[in-house]
Curated annotation (Swiss-Prot):
Belongs to the mimivirus BTB/WD family. Residues 80-149 form the BTB domain. This is Putative BTB/POZ domain-containing protein L275. GO terms for biological process: protein homooligomerization. Coiled coil: none annotated.
Amino acid sequence: MSKSSTCPITIKSINGRFQTTFGTIKQFNKMVELIDTNNTINLDMDSDRIEKILNYLRGYNCSLKLIAYDANKLGLDISYDGYVYINVGGRVYYVDKDFIKSKLEFFKIFFKYNNHCHPDYSGIVIDRDYRVFEKVLRHIKGKQNDNHNLSTELDYYGLNKPIHIIEPSYFNHYSMKKNMYVKIPSTIDDKNFYCKDDIETMIYLSYKYISLIVIFFEKEIPEDISGLQFYRFVGHGFGEYDKKSCGLKSISKSQNMILIHSIPYSTEHIKNNKNTKESYYHRPLELHVNKNLNIREVVFLEKMSIDKQPDNVTCIKDYFLFKKNFGSEGGLTDFVSFNLSEFLFVDYPQCAIKKMYLKSNSKISHVEIKCNNNLVLNSPVNYIGTKDIYRITFLTVSKSRLNLLIDNRTDLNFTVYFHRKCVDQLIFGYKILRL
């Protein structure tokens, strides 16, 4: 007996119960065959996966990539080039093979020694918690997790940490929130901002010119940062001072750098602290950095005047778009290169790129910038799922979000790398400001 499209169908899972209509599932024969005399389908499947499949059939914009294995068992045809099945803790995932290999060392070895199973590796159980694995997947895609304590699991899978290479001497403008900053020389009015001896480097933080200080190190900053000590002159000598009170804003270990807000050498803060004597703010504040931390460069930044701030600066256009085709059917490629002179307008020589994003059907791995063949920046990209774009994370330090601005100089060459060879079009979006 045929069923009407409005006939309710109950679906029972391992840990839940759902209802849909026959009209939603009737085009999928495998699901129809599972309907019993009580108009019920019993599935040995988790409820969250069934819910995703049903919403997909109802026309919602949701992806079934990760659960394609279960979807295909129910008669849906979900397939993508370069994707394979893996089994983690009894749950099968459909993943981009090249992408997961590039991010997790574990899977390079796993695929190498089990290549005879390609493309379905689900017969081999990776004995780890699948719920934690899903957080690992979110982590390597640049998405936020509710639980950031993944170090043990990331160590197990052998996370390939993105390599950040930054040569600060090539970048003169920075931004953070709504403020813009310009790099200033380390000597103003014949007063040095820092000096060093055989034991440590001393950086003076109480100059009225300085707003931010960025310190780049030669190697990764250790967990124990006792080699960074703040001192304030009190009475007849210097006393150690609390790091947070001294403006230590954030530490980025992946980029081997720290960000410090300079303590103003002025009386501005006295307005908010009426009981504090003015002389308190004129006492020198110093940061002492042990030589074992190996400072590579210290960058002093001055906040640009209010008429130079992004909110008051004339944006030439909300976004410019620059499109670059690459690859061909006979010659696939995994990168595309271009020079700034190809898309920045000569009419605006005094400008900086404020925001940048990349859009491509192919997955982007990282971005490289060279100046006269010298590598000045290597940066990963963050995927923004809601907008289906990648944002270039040139320099982002924790929640402070300090970013480099790219000056309009024609000697800069961009190269965008992809996870696999392809034919595609790269869309480069950017917003520029007058300086």
